[in-house]
């Protein structure tokens, strides 16, 4: 019965961190079960800033078949029905010389940054973006939580973004603060709206995300004319909103 009611023209599209899972945590069995139920009614997709490996760590190894669409790196790597349907490369787009200039400057900036602790993996190069973390991505969860609180008071990431934006204005880059400890850097237009080019068949796209404010990594897709945007505060809130929108009968 449920499958027959499915509205193929409607897509529910979800951010990962803070929307389907707690930040950098694994999805709960309850959320997986709810998503399965939701898929009986509407088409379901996820779009995350992280690469597919990290999204799989959070949503499970079968993620590309658990959802109709999986967009990693904001959709620069796109899967539909478990199959790869598109990729885009930052290296090809910017070239090695400009990449090296950006990475060198960023590492020098972090080296001179006075913050309580630093760990490792300050820059992570992905196929479609660069992720920059002033504290370093391999800090512990406790250190992540502490840095997030420190950053809210001292604006470490916003200040760093401001410097980089001015220094590299000629590259037309977007800087998007997301998660607890880092920010993403990518060419303008390579934000989460990038995935919408694969979704033209849908008459209604509902997007759910927690960082929908200006500067947050859900902002552009939340504001897009192509989507109906919903701001969520937690995975539980996501479930409640979806129930009232899609499963209210």
From Swiss-Prot:
Mg(2+) 2 binds at residues 222, 227. Keywords: Cytoplasm, Isomerase, Magnesium, Metal-binding. GO terms for cellular component: cytosol. The active site is at residues 15, 17. It is found in: Cytoplasm. One of its GO terms (biological process) is GDP-mannose biosynthetic process. It comes from the Eukaryota. GO terms for molecular function: metal ion binding; phosphomannomutase activity. Expressed in roots, leaves, flag leaves and immature spikes. Belongs to the eukaryotic PMM family. PANTHER family: PHOSPHOMANNOMUTASE. Homodimer. Catalyzes the interconversion of mannose-6-phosphate to mannose-1-phosphate, the precursor for the synthesis of GDP-mannose. GDP-mannose is an essential sugar nucleotide for the synthesis of D-mannose-containing cell wall polysaccharides (galactomannans and glucomannans), glycolipids, glycoproteins and the antioxidant L-ascorbate. Can complement the yeast temperature-sensitive mutant sec53-6. This is Phosphomannomutase. The gene is PMM.
